[in-house]
Amino acid sequence: MAANPSGQGFQNKNRVAILAELDKEKRKLLMQNQSSTNHPGASIALTRSPLNKDFRDHAEQQHIAAQQKAALQHAHAHSSGYFITQDSAFGNLILPVLPRLEAE
């Protein structure tokens, strides 16, 4: 099966066009950012984003808390072990509590 060289040329041209458009948008945004620092009134739209971010963070925390509660209830109902909710570096919602046994 022979590759279609004209199709590859079209893909390359398409990629170049997309990259050029992205570069143009990047420059446009950089220019807007520079002009907004020169004009304090222009940065009003930028100050609203932390409020939305805080709202999303709060909603995400509530969702995680609900997931932790459900996972904890399930673990206690189906296991004889003891579990706690704690942030995990690996994304675990609950962690098992293991007793320390002293060496004899």
From Swiss-Prot:
InterPro entries: SOSSC. The keyword DNA damage applies. It comes from the Eukaryota. GO terms for cellular component: nucleoplasm; nucleus; site of double-strand break; SOSS complex. The keyword Nucleus applies. Pfam families: SOSSC (PF15925). One of its GO terms (biological process) is DNA damage response. It is found in: Nucleus. Keywords: DNA damage, DNA repair, Nucleus. Belongs to the SOSS-C family. Belongs to the multiprotein complex Integrator. Component of the SOSS complex, composed of SOSS-B (SOSS-B1/NABP2 or SOSS-B2/NABP1), SOSS-A/INTS3 and SOSS-C/INIP. Component of the SOSS complex, a multiprotein complex that functions downstream of the MRN complex to promote DNA repair and G2/M checkpoint. The SOSS complex associates with single-stranded DNA at DNA lesions and influences diverse endpoints in the cellular DNA damage response including cell-cycle checkpoint activation, recombinational repair and maintenance of genomic stability. Required for efficient homologous recombination-dependent repair of double-strand breaks (DSBs). This is SOSS complex subunit C. The lineage of its organism: Eukaryota, Metazoa, Chordata, Craniata, Vertebrata. The gene is INIP.
